[in-house]
Amino acid sequence: ACFELSRFADSLDAHFAIETGPETSATLKKFLDSLGSTGVAVNLDPANLVMVTGDDPAKAVYNLRDYIVHTHAKDGVQIFYKDPEIVYGIKKDPLVTGDSFEEVPLGEGSVKWDEYLAALNDIGYKGFLTIEREVGDDPEKDIGNAVNFLKGYMD
């Protein structure tokens, strides 16, 4: 199905972007390479990488450089490692309970923003950097703070 989807996107000179999440960037790259197309591409979410797999977002940028068409500005921390199949409800394990990660305001988590943004610049990424804030008591305030945080890298 993804092979057909990638070819359809190619025929439209478009991309279907899949968001990073339960897999490492190496696993995702292997899958995307198997399609032989960039019709199925990547929305790189650095927080999902650090929260779920513990993957380094800057290394993911270099690894997925040929496929990145969009990226999020989101931050988080991994509290403990939990199999991604358990995180996303594919498998159950009654012995593994509790939240294994937490989304936090931009700049307060484990994403190394200087390295991540430098990597995006190194590969020539010129697309959007969309602020995503899914939780928190005051998302509007968090988004405003995120704008200010990112401006510090763009001055």
Question: Model regions: which residues?
Answer:
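Active-site acidic/histidine proton-transfer and metal-coordination neighborhood
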Residues: 1-42, 51
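A structural alpha-helix within SAM-dependent methyltransferase catalytic domains
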Residues: 3-6, 10, 29-32, 36, ...
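A general structural motif
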Residues: 11-13, 37-39, 66-68, 124-128
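Active-site beta-loop-alpha junctions enriched in small/polar residues
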Residues: 14, 19-23, 45-49, 73-78, ...
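Short alpha-helical
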Residues: 23-26, 111, 137-138
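Gly/Pro-rich active-site loop or hairpin
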Residues: 50-125, 140-144
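C-terminal helical cap(s) of enzyme catalytic domains, especially alpha/beta-barrels
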Residues: 139-155
